[in-house]
């Protein structure tokens, strides 16, 4: 079991503290993403603690645990360990398989609220009904449709598709295939791939023989996506890529840079008022606001804090009852950097509508309605456009 447990403490001994868990894959395929995501969540905790308005001036302790992202059993053990620390709620998990495993073992959760910044939702909906789970990461159903819209907008007539042979890849390719066929785009081939192979030259050769104006890669960058891009470029098979959200991280830009100038992708996110507010908060905290899922991580943490205030208690059941209350209308809109305002309004019995960095709104099933950004690549920077 690869597991770690460590603390970031935002309190003075004069005040009571509330523990909130952060259950991310700090080791494994997304280990380059999760540290900044955790720091972003902790920005919200720090903001609430500094306000001195949370309940009776209580402070937040964040308790981090490593879910690995690849080992469901390790994720379950990490969840048990973090819950044994008496956390009031959890920000996490992130990866689909680990989240499914944790949610399916209801005895682990003991009715504790989990808010995931990233775990895609369709295959988790049935499990959510048994537990208290919300996902700020928008669903693969919407993601596949957005990616199809981008493909059409780029005037791609024929496309080859390769997807990961896991739940994420299977769910996404089903939606994407249906959506692009309705747009009249010809699919030259659909190929699945095993994760984390060292060599994907045979898969790329198959894609090349089928042809196409571009290749859509529906998988994870750290679990084969990087190697597929590299093999495509090295062989001259493709130089234009349509990439799903899990292909996006800074390493992608650092490795390939201008070689992606013809390519496009999507991630969940927003360029609206909330995003601008979050950029200022993140910049002050030394965090890159354009990094994947940092806005969602801040929002997940903020919702837990506001739900505590709305219910007047850090009791687990009280938090669960108040997530929808603080995230959806009606109420005064609250943006990043305005948690003190939100806490004050709630203390006075007023209603709030937490808009956050990512236009937070949930269905009754706990699914994010969400918004998306189209990505283009310019050197080692992402260029974003609201979809």
What are these regions (language model features)?
Residues 6, 15-387:
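Extracytosolic ligand-binding ectodomains
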Residues 1-10:
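Bacterial N-terminal signal peptides
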